[in-house]
């Protein structure tokens, strides 16, 4: 049974949990005070545009046309140049997906699919009042009636999958609740910059229910506890990339140099 403090801040998501654990002040800016990002990071704008291009391409829009539609929201020349470099791989990726669909008996494709579960991990609507944890899957394919392949697009620097374990496990917990016929799950990380898809070993339904689901609930409780004493700051290396840094009290702190006496070593 979730704690009251966890229920207060529901619905949770992977990014919401990680934000609470990293910096309670940022959590309050985003999820309690609901202040819009005053200074979105360039990589966030580029990543969002790339996701839009991939979404359109996977739904049948020609890759060049999909890229042009997504590029229209970017006004900075440097961001446009970075976007153009990344979208070179959109066409080859959709070709790989089409090849996969021809080789497998795909019953269903979903793109940018929003899922949610209740506190007992049964499925519910994304915006439902009883949603406890939720997420959006970039693309997934149900094939051969009992296999589900999930692909998550990443536009940043390629990282070891273990660094995204909580987010990826959350997708599996959500998917297991929504696709009841699935028995085996495959997770692929699409590294857009390197034009590669890195697949995890197959995950069984038993592994999701026995290990991943309890870990997810534990992480939510840890996040709720981290923000329970209010919006305290937690300065760290992430501050330089924070969109709220100009609003944060920690950015106003000044450290004075220490004066030593001449006769001290």
Residues covered by each model-derived region:
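Metal-dependent nuclease catalytic regions and adjoining charged, substrate-binding loops involved
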Residues: 11-12, 94, 118-123, 129, ...
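A non-catalytic, helix-rich entry segment at domain boundaries
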Residues: 49-123
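Residue-level recognition of the N-termini of beta-strands and the immediately preceding loop/turn
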Residues: 109, 148, 183-187
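Nuclease catalytic cores
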Residues: 14-62, 110-113, 244
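A short acidic-Thr-Gly-centered motif at the start of a beta-strand
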Residues: 98-103, 129-132, 138-145
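Short alpha-helix boundary/capping segments
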Residues: 41-45, 159-166
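Conserved catalytic cores of phosphodiester-cleaving nucleases, focusing on short active-site segments
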Residues: 23, 50-51, 135-157, 170-171, ...
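Short beta-strand or tight-loop elements
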Residues: 107-113, 131-137, 235
């Amino acid at each position: 049974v979730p704690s009251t403090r966890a229920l207060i801040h529901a619905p949770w998501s992977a990014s919401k949990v990680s934000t609470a654990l990293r910096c309670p002040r940022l959590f309050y800016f985003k999820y309690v005070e609901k202040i819009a990002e005053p200074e979105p990071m360039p990589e966030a704008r580029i990543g969002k545009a790339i996701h839009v291009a991939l979404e359109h391409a996977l739904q049948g829009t020609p890759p060049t046309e999909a890229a042009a539609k997504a590029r229209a929201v970017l006004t900075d020349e440097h961001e446009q140049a970075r976007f153009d470099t990344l979208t070179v791989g959109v066409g080859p990726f959709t070709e790989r997906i089409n090849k996969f669909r021809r080789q497998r008996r795909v019953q269903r494709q979903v793109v940018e699919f929003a899922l949610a579960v209740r506190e007992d991990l049964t499925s519910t609507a994304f915006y439902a009042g009883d949603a406890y944890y939720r997420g959006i899957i970039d693309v997934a394919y149900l094939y051969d009636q009992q296999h589900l392949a999930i692909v998550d697009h990443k536009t940043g620097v390629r990282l070891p999958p273990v660094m995204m374990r909580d987010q990826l496990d959350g997708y599996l917990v959500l998917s297991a609740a929504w696709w009841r016929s699935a028995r085996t799950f495959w997770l692929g990380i699409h590294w857009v910059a390197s034009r590669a898809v890195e697949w995890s070993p197959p995950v069984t339904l038993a592994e999701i229910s026995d290990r991943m689901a309890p870990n997810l609930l534990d992480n939510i409780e840890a996040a709720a506890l981290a923000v329970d004493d209010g919006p305290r700051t937690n300065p760290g290396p992430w501050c330089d990339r924070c969109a709220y840094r100009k609003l944060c009290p920690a950015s106003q702190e000044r450290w004075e140099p220490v004066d030593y006496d001449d006769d001290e070593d």
